[in-house]
Amino acid sequence: MGEQLCPEPVTDGTLVKWNMNTGNRYRLAWRLTPGRRFTTTDLMTFRFVELIGLPFELTPAMLRGVTVRRASCGEGSHMDCDSPLLCDLWRLTRNTVELTTQDLYVDSQSRERGAYEGDALINQLAAYSFESDCATARFSLEYLYAHRTWPAEYILWITEAAYEDYMATGDDSSLVRWYPILRGKTFSAFTDADTGLLHSGNAGGAGTDAVLVDWPPSERDGYDMSVRYNTVLNCAAVAGYEALARIAAVVGETGDSGEFAARAAALREAILTRLYDPATGDFSDGLYQDGSRSAHISQHTAAYALYAGVYRDSAMADRIAGRLWERSLRPDAGGSRIRMSVYGTYFLLMGLYRTGHGSMANSLLLDGDSRPGQRTFSYMLRRSVGDFPSPFDGLPVGATLTTEAWNSVNKPNMTFSHPWGAAAAVAIVRGVFGVMPTSPGFETFSVHPQTESMTGEPILSGELCLPTVRGIIQVSVSRGNCSVRFVGASVPPAKSTSSE
């Protein structure tokens, strides 16, 4: 059993790659005794099964598959549009959420099977794109509140995930219960009085509170990891403080709310003063211990700044996004347009959508370049499992679930069942169709589609059905001449707003 087929039979004659990239060896040897039955149970993540050495001819009628699985997450959810690639991405991410979710959000069932905060944030928001049942998300988050993992940014992202849970459910009981722990998920103790910036307390680059930036390390776009005050970490801290300010307000801790909001504002200003170059529109990777600025500029710095709202006004956000486009995102910039992992790409895409630059985000999301080695979702769909026919869900070749990395060159032990690659689901709902809750439990929501593309054809028409705790939001978009002509929303029985 395995996730891939071998290009040609290996020495033992097998076609299924049972000695997997992940280090698992999915090969079972059974000695069959005439007249006797046996049963076996294991949890394995595989796509192909090969039976070898049977003492009789095997026919399809002899095989029966039995599965134990959660209820389908797709009930009530629907998306269709005039972009075949976007429709394929919708199915790919829906299948990923449905088939990788058991009782806890984990990075992948085919390797660690561990829960991680950064993975859970993307998994959670992707799941909200298809289902209104938020129980698995809440259980996973509450597990992580008490069982943190090592990356420094992850303890900051978990507060954002906590607030997203409240906005999706309208239920504040989890925030009330866990607030004493959530309020401590900061690096305030490591704020430098001279610069106003913070660090994680771990200068060694490994172990608890080491700064991740991105994973695997080959996907960091050459990030200068020797800096003491890391731009990505500081941007994540701004987002974390703002999430805590909102959470504190919900649970009635108004003093804490004001303090966290003030910290977010002060840190934002410190980043812009110390790490941003107004002459170029670029962010440095960070400051060294002596206060000097790193000369290196990675794609991550601008992406995380846009995501976390690290800019003074919309004009500055436009400048940052425009510079990001010119430096690396435009097709003729040289090299890969996306210079981040499938995990980091979530922050890149959503940073662009959040600042109204959906035309740039869509150009990346719908990049049809599926040549070997490209960092595109098209490559993930059509190339990442090899050039073998796939019977799954109508996709001709490629991945059937989102992958851990863009390709195995960047991460040789990559899995082919990694929900942190499902950023496209969030991009479709919150970016392309622009549906966002504006009050807890979707009592009110906004609709602000972004269907343009800086390259290629825009999305001319589409429709989305989004399940929520209050019912299904139905949105249809019809465009012409680069403007949204109509947005129709069938609203569940609660107050709502719709804006073009």
Could you tell me what each predicted segment is?
Residues 15-26, 30, 146-157, 190-263, ...:
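The feature captures the catalytic groove of carbohydrate-active enzymes
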Residues 94-104, 131-151, 178-197, 263-282, ...:
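Long, well-ordered core segments of solenoidal/helical folds
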Residues 1-103, 107, 119, 133-141, ...:
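Extracellular/oxidizing-compartment recognition motifs
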